[in-house]
């Protein structure tokens, strides 16, 4: 009997290996810093269609400074979030896999520091792993030692609150920017915290030039000379806004143009480590040409199922565009 079960185990393992090998063989060979994708111009394009941007709900973008790893997030139908990674090994990008530190609890918003030593993210994981998932988001980080990510740790010193604290982004000098709903107004505001060694000082809320509506999903430039963030409730509309820092005075935020804000539901801004490309997430839908075909229930069901196999069907996809588009806003600030 024991030999029988050992044989079954060997067969199962062999089948699993065959499946993994088949998936690897079917996955396209992707090389270069940006997953082998053709560089975009000044018109946003879907990033890595049917590889990263699929019929699922993808958000966030995060490359390591040496372009050996790429991270993004997926929102599952049950509203659970998971961080996915791709690694550059043997001169090619591997297929997407759930990141080694994610998958058990809701995780999102990955950001890697310029030196590549820290990966920040948000999570609903409890500090006590015997407890259930938290209701609010907190900011965590994970260090890299000898090429391997270590155990996640929750940020301290007042960074996290009893409300959602999300979308960490860090400047070149180590200042942390993030969004929080801690003041209890049902809005989120942008806070920043200067670094003190490997820790952070108490966070400071940015003034009303920036805050006052609903602000979240911040990207701070390495030199802190501009900031892009998501906002709701402004008279200009919803979506992504940009502001510039002039001698420690932030300009009035301007809504980015319709080439970026295609639907008003654009978020998760990020600029690549080399500064070449601007990434963001959008729920833009590309409508097919209308026809007079008589719909049947079967056709409706087929189209609905098919919508989960293709990007640009309204479920959030990742876009990218040449970062020179940001300079255009700078000139008109």
Where are these regions (language model features)?
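Short, conserved micro-motifs composed of acidic
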Residues: 22-333
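C-terminal motif of bacterial Sec signal peptides marking the signal peptidase cleavage site
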Residues: 14-16
């Amino acid at each position: 009997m024991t030999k029988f079960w050992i044989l079954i185990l060997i067969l199962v393992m062999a089948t699993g290996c065959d499946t993994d090998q088949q998936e690897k063989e079917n996955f396209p060979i992707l090389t270069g810093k940006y997953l082998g994708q053709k560089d975009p111009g000044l018109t946003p394009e879907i990033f890595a269609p049917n590889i990263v941007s699929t019929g699922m709900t993808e958000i966030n973008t995060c490359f390591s400074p040496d372009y050996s790893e790429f991270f993004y997030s997926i929102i599952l139908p049950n509203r659970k979030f998971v961080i996915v990674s791709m690694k550059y090994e043997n001169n090619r990008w591997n297929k997407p896999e759930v990141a080694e530190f994610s998958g058990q609890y809701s995780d999102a918003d990955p950001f890697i520091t310029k030196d590549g030593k820290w990966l920040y993210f948000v999570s609903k994981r409890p500090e006590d792993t015997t407890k259930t998932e938290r209701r609010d988001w907190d900011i965590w980080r994970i260090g890299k030692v000898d090429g391997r990510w270590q155990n996640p740790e929750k940020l301290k010193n007042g960074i996290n609150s009893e409300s959602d604290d999300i979308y960490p982004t860090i400047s070149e000098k180590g200042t942390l920017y993030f969004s929080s709903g801690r003041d209890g107004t049902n809005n989120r505001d942008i806070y920043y915290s200067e670094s003190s060694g490997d820790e952070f000082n108490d966070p400071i809320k940015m003034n009303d030039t920036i805050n006052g509506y609903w602000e979240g999903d911040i990207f701070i430039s390495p030199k802190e000379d501009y900031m892009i963030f998501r906002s709701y409730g402004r008279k200009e509309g919803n979506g992504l806004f940009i502001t510039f820092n002039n001698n420690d005075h932030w300009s009035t935020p301007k809504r980015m143009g319709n080439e970026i804000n295609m639907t008003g539901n654009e978020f998760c801004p990020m600029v690549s480590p080399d500064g070449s490309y601007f990434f963001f997430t959008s729920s833009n839908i590309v409508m097919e040409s209308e026809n007079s075909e008589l719909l049947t229930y079967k056709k409706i069901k087929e189209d609905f199922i098919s919508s989960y196999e293709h990007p640009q069907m309204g479920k959030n996809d990742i876009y990218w565009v040449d970062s020179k588009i940001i300079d255009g806003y700078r000139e008109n600030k």
